[in-house]
Amino acid sequence: MSKSDADLVLMARQGDQAAIGEIYDRYADRLFGFAFSMLRDREEAADAVHDVILRSSQKLDQLRDPSKLRPWLFSIARNEVTSRTRQRSRRDDREVPDMAADLPDSDNSLIQNELQQLVWDAADGLQQRDRELLELQMQGLEGEELAEALGVKLSHVHVLSSRMRDRMEKAVGSLLIARLGREDCDKLNELLSDWDGHFSLEVRSNVTRHIEDFYICTNKRGILCAP
């Protein structure tokens, strides 16, 4: 029978190194997924996870409720990612993970992978807080756990989630227009003449404003984003 998070915390507090190892085994992959989605660098994400586990093992006595280990770890991870992001003098080139080798031979899987990549790419056009919220939800956090990880009240999580979803939908639509709408709109083509393909916050804002001002792109976004 597997031990609960609370059991592992209590054992680790008593110096049980095996318990710390179990905490690592249980959460390292999910913490890495969060860190990589924010940092876009595998090596730096791995370093971040190492620091999160090390820091958390040193501060276990500060965890008031041992059953809340998961949101507490993600809260530490969020702070670690924010710190590393601020230390960067410029954005690193994004490393896109090689998913193709892991895909089963199925059209549905290929389509699902393309949709996931589209969402991932569009998320680059969001503010960091929205990206953090999106990734924490993808890691399975919700309700009180999500509030704990974000450091906000539970009632505020619902507001943040609703706003993030709205901005995410607009970001996906804007990315699709940026990729597929230039042939139909000279103004859009001119706007994106120097675009390198990375969907940054600035690009998203510019394209979104353009869509609102030009009917041809508004209409095309509606077609591309139709259910």
Sequence positions of predicted segments:
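Short helix-coil-helix linker/hinge
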Residues: 113, 123-131, 185-186, 200-201
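Arg/Lys-rich amphipathic alpha helix in sigma70-family domain 2
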Residues: 37, 58-65, 74-96, 105, ...
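Short amphipathic alpha-helical boundary/capping segments
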Residues: 8-11, 118-126, 195-198
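Helix-turn-helix DNA-binding module
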Residues: 136-156, 191
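Short, charged helix-capping/linker segments at alpha-helix termini
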Residues: 3, 13-22, 32-51, 61-64, ...
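Short amphipathic alpha helix immediately N-terminal
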Residues: 24, 126-142, 204-207
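Hydrophobic positions on the alpha-helical face of helix-turn-helix-like DNA-binding modules
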Residues: 52, 76, 133-134, 146-147, ...
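Short, amphipathic alpha-helical interaction patch
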Residues: 179-210
